[in-house]
Amino acid sequence: MDANLKADPMPIEGIDYVELYVGNAKQATYFYKNGFGFTPVAYSGPETGVRDKTSYLLQQGDIQLLITSALSPDHPISRFVITHGDGVADIAMRVKDAEWTYKEAVKRGAKGIQTPKILKDENGVLRGAAIAAYGDTIHTFIERHGYHGTFAPGFRPLSEKADSIGLKRVDHVVANVEEGKMD
C-alpha cells in the first residue's frame, strides 16, 4: 500500500459508470441516445460470447451509462426489473486498487457482494469487486489502469453517433430509501 492510500482511507478517483438494469436494453439505449444525447460506444451479448445478458455502454462527456438486460426470465437482472422496474443497479467507482479498496470497505463494515476478481483479454487486465450499497443497489470498485480495450472484456466497439445535449459528468448521486429504512 502506498502513502496516498494511508492518507485517504477510501480513495475514489471518480464514478466509472452507472449501470441500469432494464427490461429491454436495445430499446432503453435508443431512448437514452435520442432523448438525452448519449452515444452507444460498446456492446456485450451473445455475439461477443456473453450468453446470459446484453449490455450497451453509452457515453456523453465523462458519463458512462451501462444499460443491461437479462436474456432469461430467471436471471437475477430479470428479478431486479420485476421488483423495481428499470433502475440503477450499480454505481461503479474507479479506484487505484480494487482489492485493497474492497478489503478496506469490508473491514469498515460494508457487506461484500463480489470478492475481488480479475477479467482479462488481449487488451489487458481489469480488476473489480463489489459491496452492497442500499436496497438492491451495489457499488463496484473498478481498477482500470491495466486495461486498454473497449470498456471491459466481452465488449466490442460500436460506431453510432448521437447529438450530445451537453452533459459533462456525474457530480453526485442521491438514493431514495423507503420510509423507516434509513439509519
Residue ranges and their predicted role:
Residues 15-22, 38, 58, 65-67, ...:
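Short, structured motif recognition centered on aromatic/hydrophobic residues
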Residues 1-26, 88-91, 148-182:
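N-terminal beta-strand motif that seeds the catalytic metal site of vicinal oxygen chelate
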Residues 10, 50, 83-86, 97, ...:
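Short, glycine/acidic-rich beta->alpha junctions
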Residues 10-13, 19-64, 107, 116-122, ...:
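Core segments of cupin and vicinal oxygen chelate
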Residues 4, 36-81, 126-153, 157:
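Conserved short beta-strand elements that form part of the metal-binding/catalytic scaffold
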Residues 32, 81-142:
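Hydrophobic or amphipathic alpha-helical targeting/insertion segments
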